[in-house]
Amino acid sequence: MTHNAPPRLDPRRTPLVAVAAAGFLVALKGTGAWMTGSLALGSAALDSLIDLFVSAANFLVLRRSAQPPDADHAYGHGKFENLAALGQGLFLVAAAVVLVWSGVRRLIEGGAPRQTGWGVAVLAISLLVSLGVAHTLRQAAERSGSPALRADSLHYATDLWVNGAALGALLVVRWTAWSPADPLVALVVAAYVLRAGSSLALEAMGDLSDRGLPEQELRRIKAIVASFAPRVVGLHDLKTRRSGGQRFIELHLEIPRATSFEDAHALTVEVLRAVERELPRSKVFVHGDPV
């Protein structure tokens, strides 16, 4: 008896799910913010509006980055994903600044949300939608290694905190009539969004500037090479970088001078395949140097 695995959504089409969900959440939260006057709910609506633009951009970027290398882009088009991730991070930082300004202004000028029951219902629905979309995007990001999809999944994971915090603020106002809870929660959300956006932008800038792979992955590469001793004496000039969801790894093997040309070539291929098995989605270049 065989069991068929459930169909998986093409990672290049996954952003369409995010676009549809973000559009729904913008309309839902925007209406709720207008009805209640809640700054916390308004901040959640702004966050979803950013998600809408970002998810739409990701759909276009993933189609572009999936194209094979060509004469003008010999190493592929993965950097488009890093550019998209950088843009998303900067969008989040900008949104956080707007939230801080709005929160401080509300604390100074005063004011309280109205019809909080509607706001509670809107945020409860938003939590469920964000949870489902975040799970879908995270799975797609893990399968594809896409920075753009990972960034999008981070947005919806952030939405869970944003929606939860806004929901808590409205419940406090509803039950205690303590109106400062609304702008205070908006400021807390702003701090969280600022941290997430900064981290995302810095990581994208690192990839765009060809920062090397993490030390943990470098140790794995060196361990693989060491496992071929004594046929391999050592390695040098290990160079790594990431472009989109793909790693690029270049290294020089130190091979005993007595090794024949044919054996040395076969050995470099063995090492190359071993590294690719250990680190999927890697483009590996191995050179053999006699010592």
What are these regions (language model features)?
Residues 1-216:
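Alpha-helical transmembrane cores and adjacent cytosolic helix/loop segments
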